[in-house]
């Protein structure tokens, strides 16, 4: 039996919403932020970033994580959020997953004490994309 883990899915497109639903179906508690235009079934949509991140074992950010203007890739959000503000809100030591992470974002994550994994750099995903 799977043990429930609290996860935060922040930003992204329909792929992130679908991922949130799959994680919920697998038995996890999932909170979403910046996915207002595509609510994820079974997940708790949160309008406050800090509330979304509270007690989250891991934070899952989109691929690509950042838009050209430095904002979080969140086309389904009702508001724009800078990637810096998002990274600054994640508690130090939290496992953070993101795709296509530029050096500046990785450096900010390290500076903030985050454990950041670029899932696009994983061979099994890179080959398929």
Where are these regions (language model features)?
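Glycine/serine-rich phosphate-binding loop and adjoining beta1-alpha1 elements at the start
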Residues: 2, 60-128
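Residues that mark the start of a beta-strand
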Residues: 4-6, 29
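Glycine-rich adenosine-cofactor-binding loop
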Residues: 7-18, 23, 129
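Residues in the short beta-alpha loop(s) of Rossmann-like NAD(P)-binding domains
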Residues: 13, 36, 100-102
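NAD(P)-binding Rossmann-fold cofactor-contacting core
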Residues: 26-42
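Short acidic low-complexity segments
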Residues: 42-55
């Amino acid at each position: 039996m799977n043990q429930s883990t609290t996860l935060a899915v922040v930003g992204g497109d329909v792929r992130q919403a679908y991922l949130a639903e799959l994680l919920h179906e697998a038995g996890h508690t999932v909170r979403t932020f910046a996915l207002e235009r595509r609510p994820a079934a079974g997940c708790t949509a949160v309008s406050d970033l800090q509330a979304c991140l509270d007690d989250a074992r891991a934070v899952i950010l989109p691929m690509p994580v950042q838009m050209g203007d430095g904002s979080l890739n969140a086309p389904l959000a009702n508001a724009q959020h800078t990637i810096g503000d998002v990274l600054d809100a994640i508690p130090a030591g939290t496992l953070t997953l993101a795709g296509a992470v530029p050096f500046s974002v990785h450096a900010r994550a390290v500076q903030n004490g985050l454990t950041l994994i670029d899932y696009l750099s994983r061979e099994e995903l890179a080959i398929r994309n």
